[in-house]
Amino acid sequence: MTAVSGDNPNSLFATPAIVADRRGDGSILVRSTTPLQESARCIGDWLEHWARQAPDRIFLGERASVETPWSTVSYRDALGIVRQAASWVLSQGLSAERPLVILSDNGIDHALFALSAQHVGVPSAAISPAYSLMSRDFDKLKSTIELLDPGAIYVASTKPFAAALAAIKPLHRAVIVSGNPEDADALAFPAIAATPESPDVAKAFAAVTPDTIAKFLFTSGSTGTPKAVINTQRMLTSSQQAKAQTWTFLEQPGAELVILDWLPWSHTFGANHNFNLVLRNGGTLYIDGGKPAPGLFATSLANLRSVVPTVYFNVPRGFDMLIAALRTDDELRRKFFEGAKFAFYAGAALPQNLWDALEELSLQAVGHRLPMVSAWGSTETSPLATDCHFLAKRSGNIGVPIPGTELKLVPSGDKLEVRVRGPNVTPGYWKAPDLTAAAFDDEGFYKIGDAVTFADPEWPDLGLFFDGRVAEDFKLNSGTWVSVGTLRVAGIAALAPLAQDIVVTGHGRDHVRFLVFPNLAACRSLAGLPESADTREAIGHP
């Protein structure tokens, strides 16, 4: 059965057309009746296209601080740097077996170096900077380096990464590249970007196919060692083709796409959804040096005062902090709502009170409600599997399957486990055949481990709602995964002997909480109370 949402804003989005086929085994196949149109051969074709069609348009912008002007690179200049850096990549013999690894945060050089490798069929792998900058044992960083055996490792500057680079030095034979020309202990990226373009670049670019590996993105590692998810060119281009078919405003004459984004390129939301959205559609991405964290969001707000995004992306925690600022800053509120076509949240569920607050502020500023949309997927689905390309009635609607992607809903206890199949789904994990085999069912659907419910089982066009994990792990509203089993054990150990057991909570919230079952005997002993002391006295003793 197919239904059309009467609230669909046709000027922005395509109307969903979804069927749900119920099978004899109890499973439900959910898909779009809109066929996926032909995708680009590779993401390099997008860069080549926009360098011809809009050579002077700003592709990327960044700034060192809120006090300095934006440094930018046009599509034409970006392509020139990509081709020249690709000449160096080829000269060093980089390949899927010896890829480019990037340890630093988002930046123009980061983007151009990654694109240069991908342009000639060499995967890049952006590793979470936290593995280098916040770890003491560097175990996760070491495991990624050992798995990938990189041919080159890029950092924006060697000084902050000195300890991490020293820790992994025995594990690789890579050239260390720095974005800072003053780093004497590394090859400077500006020198690489000035490499004379080799005729081999055009040949290597022509040899790239949809099956060529574009990048490796690592899972969070919340349940163990991070896994390297293979991202092919087909995954990335088909995902953005589906996005263009659902976000139809992207291809309307005169459409302008400007985003200001902090989301890290070591994760699929920032790297594959947002960055590739800009590249595929000839937009402009201003790199936000802030983030929704204490002491850092002021930078994001300053950047919002400088750049007016046409689409705003964030995780729920980011919206929480933004709303607080919009309530007190009239000028920022006006500029934000006048410029944004809609807002997009993902990474975790958006609390309804934040949804309501954003709508209220929008009405105050411009007299209409700002559309709020979302999507759902994972690193393994690059990431788009469903998209809420309609006006949902409330927060939490993750939308419907994108064109070309099928969902299989499998009964699992009192939940419907959701599985995914389509050109956007990974072929597997790098050098992990057992993990790859275990990740798919006998029909080739990826077992993501999430559960969903229909907004209305009779009207699949009205979307799906995330219904938790089939297993026990969950996300905070920052998008951070919480490893429940690991944290429970660590919490009990930290509180020993006072905690008998712990229930870990916090799904969709801004922090983790423990529901503690006390060891009353230990509590009485610590407080110096007799065994006859009651529970309230034992746990309430100062």
Located regions from the model:
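Conserved pre-ATP/AMP-binding loop-to-beta segment of ANL
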Residues: 55-58, 176-178, 185, 191-218, ...
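Conserved AMP-binding A3 loop
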Residues: 71-76, 205-206, 214-241
